[in-house]
Every structure is written in structure tokens, then in C-alpha cells.
Amino acid sequence: MGFSYDRYSRMISNPVRNYWALIAGRHDTNAFSVIDAAYREPQRRYHDWGHIVDLLTKLDCLKALAVRPDLIAAAIFWHDAVYVTRDDDGLLRPDAENVRASATLFERHSKFDETDAQAIHDLIMATANHLNARATVEHYPGFSRDLDLFLDLDLSSLGASWSEFEQNLARLRFEYAWVPEPLFCLGRLQMIDTFAAHGDALYRLDETRKLWCARAHQNLARAQAELRRQVARLASSA
């Protein structure tokens, strides 16, 4: 019941339709409406339906690597369901708070059995620390690998073409439009430096490393250089 083809078939892409049809019966009837409203929020430009479609499309291509693609798909649908860049007091909201809120929202609408629900919860929570998160419980044989695949998918946009990478940076800038330019550039540079410092360990699986790692580091190096020039220019004009 949770998914209506009549209502959504003209609005959303095939990966969304197909994967939601796979897991709709393990959600309450309001779940898709909640997700749909979230990813259409006007303050989003990167963390919107485009991001979800991208991840589901890649999951579909790489599903032979997954033990439970249905659970990975559920985590994809919910992992950015709550995305707010600043709190009511105007301060930067930590990503971890959005992740926790997204996991809680999933639990509110889930009808998965207890083991599967906890696995999805842990997949979502792992996005609070992409580079260092590890499975602490093997919810099913192969869960650790599914977690690694899910996190690699979420970072796959780093290995996009340069033009898409640039567009993603612009989309993120829109989401943080309230942050002054010097602070935003410094924050982006710190994030990119962290990704770049991980070398081949940026991606966890051999298969995804071969797909995205080389291009990702080319993009990161180019972005580092451009952001450093921008930071220097902003500092000199201050």
C-alpha cells in the first residue's frame, strides 16, 4: 500500500519506482510521502532526489556485489531524509545530527523485522563518518561488505566527471548559502583535504576503487588548488 504508481509514476525515475516497489510493503502507508516531501524541500540542491536516483542507479549496476540490495536501497532512501544545515539558533548543524534524525525517521515508518531494521539503521548511521565507520555487528553474513558498498556508493560522486563534480560543489554551496564565503571555502577545503589524504582507502571495495578512485583524486586535487587560490584571494581582499 505504501507506494502508488498512479500518483508517482510520472514524477519519479525507474530506479526509484523499482526499488521502492521492492521494499514498500515493509513500510507504513505514509513512508513514501514522507520521503518524497523531504527530498523536494526547497533548501536542497545536492541532497535531493537527484542524489537518491544516482545512488539507486549505481546500486542497480553493482547489485551483484551486494548480499542484501533491498536493505541497501532502504538505507539510500532514508539516509538523507533529514537534511538541515543550520539549527533554529542559526548555528551550523552537525551532519551527525541529521544522520541520527534520518535514522529515527526511518524507524518511525519501518515495518521491517527487527534484524533487518537494525541493519538499515546501522547503514544510515555509518554515513555520519564515511571514512572510518565500520560494522560492529554482523547482522547477516555479508553485512560488513554491504556497509562498505553503501558508503562507497555515497561517495561515488567524487569520481564523477569534473563538470559534474563542479556542479555538485555549486549545489552544496546553495545548501550553505547562509555561510559567509570565506568560511564556506575553508570548510570545503578541509573536507576535500580529508578525502584526498585517504588515498586508495577513499573507497573500500576493489570493484568501486577501480571505478571511481583515480577520477576522484584528480577531481580532489583540482578542487584543492582552486579552493586554495580562492581562500588566498578572499584573505587578501579582507
Map each language-model feature to its residues:
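Divalent metal-dependent phosphate-bond-processing catalytic cores, especially two-metal-ion Mg2+/Mn2+ enzymes
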Residues: 2-19, 40-47, 58-68, 78, ...
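Short alpha-helical hairpin
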Residues: 21-37, 51
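Alpha-helix N-cap and coil->helix boundary residues
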Residues: 30, 67, 71-73, 97, ...
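Histidine-centered active-site/metal-ligand motif
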Residues: 47, 51, 79, 98
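An active-site-proximal "capping" alpha-helix that borders the catalytic cofactor pocket
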Residues: 55, 95-111
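His-Asp-centered metal-binding catalytic motifs of divalent-metal-dependent phosphohydrolases/nucleases
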Residues: 55, 69-87, 102, 122-128
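Metal-dependent catalytic cores of enzymes that make or break cyclic nucleotides
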Residues: 88-94
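Polymerase palm active-site segment centered on the conserved acidic dipeptide of motif C
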Residues: 105-132, 136
